[in-house]
Amino acid sequence: MQLSKSILLAALAATPSLVNAMLPIHIKNYRFIKPSSATNSESDNEVFFVKGVDYQPGGSSGYDADSDTDILSDPEVCARDAYAFQQLGVNTVRIYSLNPDLNHDKCMTIFNNAGIYAILDVNSGNYGESLNRADPSGTYDSLYLSRVFKFIDAFKNYPNVLGFFSGNEVINDQSDYAKIDPPYIRAVQRDMKQYISKHANRSIPVGYSAADNTDLRLATFKYLQCNSLDGNKVNDDLDISKSDFFGLNTYEWCSGTSSWESSGYDKLNSTFEDAVIPLIFSEYGCNKNTPRTFDEVSEGLYGGLKNVFSGGLVYEYTEEANNYGLVKLDDSGSLTYKDDFVNLESQLKNVSLPTTKESEISSDSIYKCDNSAITNIYSGFGTNNFTLPSQPAEIANMIEYGVNGTNTGKILTDYAVPTTFNYTIKNNKDDTISATISYDKANSLNELDVTATTVAKSASTSQSSSRSLTSSTSPSSSTGSSSSTGSSSASSSSKSKGVGNIVNVSFSQSGYLALFAGLISALL
């Protein structure tokens, strides 16, 4: 396709605006992949393991949709916690509830520069902000999805967003929830992934966090990761609705009393050996015995399970009523490390993980949707023969045209990220720590261009060999119809290469000059 001269001339007049940021994580088969540079070479990129914590200070009551604050709106708090995350040795946080209407630029920039990725739940416990497991058909509507799409808009431009969770423990063994909820989870994931492919500048993985129920979680996993009716060919409708990664909330290993065998960890490898999407523990850290020693870190998750699982997130960062915290916050906002913090820090320091290149990971990611295999595990599981609820016209319209959200976040170029903060941090001996945040230059490898999206989108059609991660261009939609029967080739883990199958164009200084020269040539 030829570029029009008007578009070419507009591009020549545009000046690139570059944002230094972390390189976004992508997926290949059952592994997360962290690019080693903006060239995104499979021979250099390495498998990424999540070493993280669940982060929701204040617990479920700490989120108020009517408030002008949430846990990522105060940069002073984020700087304090970024320091603690660095000392703990984590690279990822999971956040359960956020307000998509608030500005999160400073906090996400701090986390980016500190080397912290985020996995974000798109839902909250408020009315209209989640799928009601008791009434999925009545709550799968435009009110709910408009909030989900606004959430995606608010966070899609932060490269340190590792992924979104479409739901948390929606499918459980109460009532008939395992029967009625599964198709609606896939419907929400379909809608999210279609929206991302239409309105985001990159593929962002969409996953699901499963309840701590041994039989039900396996049935859920097989249902949510499948993308083929015959096991030989990917079905587009199934691929766009499958989970890109899968989280297990598991509390089976309790410090001091559990072992590899008694915890059931010895069965996890064989149970999930056929995974074609990344597996993590989205919550772990039994608190039956305190302080927790986290033996399951070195002996389990990053030990015997490391060939199948990709790490996990300890529950949880701050001490709440349920006594799972790693740190205690006082009324002034200052924090003190618990013994649990020190023990987890020690365990994470002693983790020894293999260095595996992306090129060593198979690209095969086909998994058969097998109704009998799923119902043999959990007889009451509702696959509905892998047919999904129809996509309401209002939702299809939002996917096509966007939700016109007023808040779209970005990494800041003119923000002097803080190295100190006005809170006191004490260790587990109650000694005050002299705290200074460090920022590794490696967290600014990605030069994101935030201009000239029209030209970049057009130019991408003639740059099929480019796999650069440095563009902020919006991919053209490949979904055709936004209806539930429409197909999409822009699934956020499609073919599990690069950042999905969306081709991006580099707009680093050298890349921009190369495009400039190409445009001149086209004009001539």
Swiss-Prot record:
One of its GO terms (cellular component) is plasma membrane. It is a lipid-anchor; GPI-anchor. (1,3-beta-D-glucosyl)n 2 binds at E169, D212, R217. The GPI-anchor is attached to the protein in the endoplasmic reticulum and serves to target the protein to the cell surface. There, the glucosamine-inositol phospholipid moiety is cleaved off and the GPI-modified mannoprotein is covalently attached via its lipidless GPI glycan remnant to the 1,6-beta-glucan of the outer cell wall layer. N-glycosylated. Residues 1-21 form the signal peptide. (1,3-beta-D-glucosyl)n 1 binds at Y96, N168, Y315. It comes from the Eukaryota. Its EC number is 2.4.1.-. Keywords: Cell wall, Cell wall biogenesis/degradation, Disulfide bond, Glycoprotein, GPI-anchor, Lipoprotein, Membrane, Secreted, Signal, Transferase. Residues 461-498 are annotated as: Disordered. The active site is at E169 (proton donor), E283 (nucleophile). Disulfide bonds join C78-C107, C226-C369, C254-C286. Residues 499-524 form a propeptide. One of its GO terms (biological process) is fungal-type cell wall (1->3)-beta-D-glucan biosynthetic process. Its main location: secreted. Transmembrane segments: none annotated. One of its GO terms (molecular function) is 1,3-beta-glucanosyltransferase activity. Present with 16400 molecules/cell in log phase SD medium. Belongs to the glycosyl hydrolase 72 family. This is Probable 1,3-beta-glucanosyltransferase GAS3.
